[in-house]
């Protein structure tokens, strides 16, 4: 579940180490197949139990500009320099306090878990704590072909998986 905080809406990133496969017509003309250069990429599902554009939103996209500038998937600026994930946010604090389930975006194996950090705004955490662990309570999953996803800023005590555990798409993580 996403953290309870009285400071600000949560950013709930599912930080991908590489961009997900774009939907594009295939050689056969069929829509929604991965482009050939990303054919081995897993198909990522939404990692939150919410409805995009209704009660959750993209806060930041993956930065596709290889240099010092920024460019999201649509050549826009909804990212920041060097960002390697897709950050999702909830509608408001009451929704966050009720809890929204964070789920695996694709099948894989849990490779890292951190739980126990307090549920506070990242702006309320000491700078040293942020430097050591900017993701707060988190789960990282390894997927096929070297892809990884990270689910950060989870509610303290909510993590339901352990290192080494296999997971399936849609399985609750925290």
Task: Indicate residue ranges for each PLM-predicted region.
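Short, basic/aromatic beta-hairpin or loop at an interaction surface
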Residues: 76-83, 140-152
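Surface-exposed, glycine-biased beta-strand/turn segments
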Residues: 29-137, 169
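A residue-level detector for short acidic-glycine micro-motifs
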Residues: 90, 112, 153-156, 174
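Compositionally biased, proline/threonine/alanine/serine-rich low-complexity intrinsically disordered stretches
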Residues: 1-39
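Short histidine-centered loop motifs in beta-beta connectors
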Residues: 96-99, 103-104, 143-170
């Amino acid at each position: 579940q996403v953290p309870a905080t009285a400071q600000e809406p949560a950013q709930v990133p599912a930080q991908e180490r590489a961009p997900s496969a774009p939907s594009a017509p295939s050689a056969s003309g069929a829509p929604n197949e991965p482009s050939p250069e990303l054919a081995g990429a897993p198909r990522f599902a939404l990692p939150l139990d919410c409805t995009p554009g209704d009660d959750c939103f993209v806060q930041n996209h993956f930065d596709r500009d290889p240099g010092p500038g920024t460019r999201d998937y649509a050549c826009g600026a909804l990212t920041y320099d060097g960002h390697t994930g897709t950050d999702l946010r909830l509608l408001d604090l009451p929704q966050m306090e009720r809890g929204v389930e964070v789920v695996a975006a694709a099948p894989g194996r849990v490779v890292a878990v951190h739980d126990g950090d307090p549920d506070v705004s990242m702006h309320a955490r000491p700078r040293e704590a942020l430097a050591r662990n900017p993701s707060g309570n988190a789960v990282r999953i390894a997927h096929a072909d070297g892809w990884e996803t990270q689910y950060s800023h989870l509610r303290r005590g909510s993590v339901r998986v352990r290192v080494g555990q296999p997971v399936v798409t849609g399985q609750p993580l925290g």
